[in-house]
Amino acid sequence: MYRCLAGILVQRRSGCDLVSYLTPRLFSKLGIKRPTWETDPLGNSFGAGGLFLTLSELHKFGLFYLNEGRWNGRQILSEQWIKESTKAADVDHYGYLFWRGEYNSYRADGKYCQISMVLPDK
């Protein structure tokens, strides 16, 4: 539930939907041109999922995380956020939208079995 609530709180605080909020701050910096986010009947983005990216855009996101929040030489997200969001927060090995795996790996799962897996130690 809290993962869904975070998206709604960002929308209410910013006054715009998650895509509009994140496009200038993140998506455009990564070259993600037209992200879409699924919404509920009230127009709230489901912050814990429902983000539609192409496979190449999902790959960019994985590279961005592998580079600890840096893209094209610029720090876009703090290294601390990357570390926090990719560590296992509960018993099922799930962090902030990332699943923890063996060998210090983590992954973001997309619809229809699309996966962006990051193995920082390899």
Label each residue range with its predicted role.
Residues 1-26, 58-64:
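Alpha-helical scaffold elements that line and support the substrate/ligand-binding pocket
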Residues 2-3, 19, 55-58, 78, ...:
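A structural signal for well-ordered alpha-helical scaffolds and beta->alpha junctions
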Residues 5-9, 47-70, 115-122:
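Active-site-proximal alpha-helical segments within enzyme catalytic domains
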Residues 13-14, 30, 65, 69, ...:
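A generic secondary-structure signal for well-formed alpha-helical elements
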Residues 14-49:
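Active-site helix/loop module of the DD-peptidase/beta-lactamase fold
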Residues 33-34, 79-122:
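Active-site Gly/Thr loop motif
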Residues 57, 63, 71-87:
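A conserved catalytic-loop motif detector
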